[in-house]
Amino acid sequence: MTLIVTGAAGFIGSNLVKALNERGEQRIIAVDNLTRADKFKNLVDCEIDDYLDKTEFVERFRRGDFGKVRAIFHEGACSDTMETDGRYMMDNNFRYSRDVLDVCLAQNIQFLYASSAATYGGSSRFVEEREVEQPLNVYGYSKFLFDQVIRRVLPTAKSQIAGFRYFNVYGPRETHKARMASVAFHNFNQFRAEGKVKLFGEYNGYAAGEQTRDFVSVEDVVKVNLFFFDNPDKSGIFNLGSGRAQPFNDIASTVVNTLRSLNNEPALSLADQVQRGLIEYIPFPDALRGKYQCFTQADQSKLRAAGYDAPFLSVQEGVDRYVRWLFGQV
């Protein structure tokens, strides 16, 4: 049977295609928008059966042009949280998703889709409950609104619907994301270019570099998606983060030490890295005051209750692997 991956040339989508290939799956229809042509590089080492532009996909999907489809991994979206064109965002992230969902429901096709931790916005709690969801931008709202649709249709759905609220994902195949790429990616490039990593200084009661995020490796994101793919009886909306809140200092320090290791230099403590000027703290920008989340951490209770029991990579493990991969691409 055929599998479909939307956003297939993007960050998470291409990692899913590669992982499916490694399981022997090659009847994969890749759907994307290659206006940003450099994304094609993410699929060069992948095997797909066909490629479609997103503009022609939904109608052909609705007509049944692809034969028997087992599942769709719906990763296609505009993920730029700085995008201010609300009509564009809602069309890409909400309306497009609704159209794909409607076909899956009508044809009893597994529907696994990308939500986002941006649905929580200004909340200090990160649990999959309507009361704590406070999106701060139109990107977060587009994901939030689609999640509300899912909550309404879940009780009567005859096929699987599984949504994943991705936290701060990092890992291979994100180069095309440019300014929206992960902190680890930018720290890597900054250290190679300048010999140091710059982090925000003290703010809102957090010491320099100690603002925290739930950083999750794309390896774990893929594993969770595949777990639900293998368990079509499990539906719902689930947080997909490591369950740990780790400071930006951990990312920067791991990037520095991994690059030092690759240069046959010994690891240094964070204090030594700062003392040597390898990590530098800059004043917190006025433009971000009052608009910046100093803490995120996925509540994994619902994910674990669904039966996913594998451990998640820590920043030290995952970023080390990622930096070594990036170094091999240089």
Curated annotation (Swiss-Prot):
GO BP annotations, alphabetical order: ADP-L-glycero-beta-D-manno-heptose biosynthetic process; carbohydrate metabolic process
Top class in the EC scheme: isomerase
UniProt: substrate binding residues: N168, R179, H186, F200, G201, E202, Y203, R213, Y292
NCBIfam families attached to this UniProt entry: heptose_epim
Family named by the database record: Belongs to the NAD(P)-dependent epimerase/dehydratase family. HldD subfamily.
Description of its domains: Contains a large N-terminal NADP-binding domain, and a smaller C-terminal substrate-binding domain.
Protein name in UniProt: ADP-L-glycero-D-manno-heptose-6-epimerase
Species in which this protein is naturally found: Paraburkholderia phytofirmans (strain DSM 17436 / LMG 22146 / PsJN)
Encoding gene per record: hldD
